């Protein structure tokens, strides 16, 4: 999704990791993790996409994604396709290398300070699936609190649904819009200037509904915010931190 609709998010993921001295590899033939097909019930297509993913990324590097939904797809849902198959060993090796960005920064790189500034009132939107399925904890909040100038508003342990859900937003468009409006109205009520989302899909969903309903608020991903906040870095490269971007 980032590649097709938000290429700047993929570029910003690169900037964030390079700022921390991480050497990166970008498999140019990569396509998708297969989540959209999986959620739509097209499991054969999702399995073929998964095979391509495993063959292209391998298991030698960390694989860092700006999306907990995609990371969960690879970490957990691929098990339905590749358990006890010819790709079983390759998948198991890769499984432990897959991380959502904030999880990677906090729990692998152990980032405890961020050299960036961004003056704004922001509300963080963490998808339910990121917490329930991927088991993301407070890593996004930890990162936001490191950025000078950020004022966090809204519930500090807030996790919700943006109403996207892949085909859900098409099949149940009215309900999807109402869910997004609830989140947008909460942010406006709390005085937020920005909604910071952990999923690119939620940025697209919330932006679309905000524009259609004349709601004046900016929406961006956590990845984009981290990159936007950067000013200077004296990070030193470590050969232990080699990743592939997915």
Give a label for each model feature.
Residues 1-246:
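Iron-sulfur cluster-binding electron-transfer modules in prokaryotic oxidoreductases
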């Amino acid at each position: 999704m980032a590649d097709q609709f938000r290429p700047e998010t993929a570029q910003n993921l690169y900037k964030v990791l390079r700022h921390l001295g991480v050497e990166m590899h970008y498999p140019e033939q990569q396509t998708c993790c297969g989540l959209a097909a999986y959620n739509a019930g097209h499991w054969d297509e999702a399995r073929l996409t998964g095979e391509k993913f495993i063959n292209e990324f391998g298991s030698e590097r960390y694989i860092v994604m700006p999306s907990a939904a995609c990371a969960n797809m690879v970490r957990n849902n691929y098990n339905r396709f590749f358990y006890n198959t010819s790709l079983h060993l390759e998948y198991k090796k890769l499984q432990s290398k897959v991380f959502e960005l904030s999880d990677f920064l906090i729990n692998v790189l152990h980032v405890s300070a961020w050299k960036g500034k961004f003056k704004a009132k922001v509300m963080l939107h963490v998808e339910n699936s990121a917490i329930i399925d991927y088991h993301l904890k407070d890593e996004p909040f930890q990162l936001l609190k490191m950025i000078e100038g950020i004022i966090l508003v809204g519930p500090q342990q807030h996790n919700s649904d943006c109403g996207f859900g892949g085909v859900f937003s098409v099949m149940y468009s009215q309900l999807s819009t109402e869910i997004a409006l609830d989140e947008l109205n909460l942010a406006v009520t709390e005085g937020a200037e920005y909604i910071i989302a952990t999923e690119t899909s939620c940025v697209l969903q919330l932006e679309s509904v905000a524009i259609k309903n004349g709601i004046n608020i900016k929406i961006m991903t956590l990845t984009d915010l981290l990159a936007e906040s950067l000013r200077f870095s004296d990070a030193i490269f470590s050969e232990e931190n080699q990743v592939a971007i997915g």
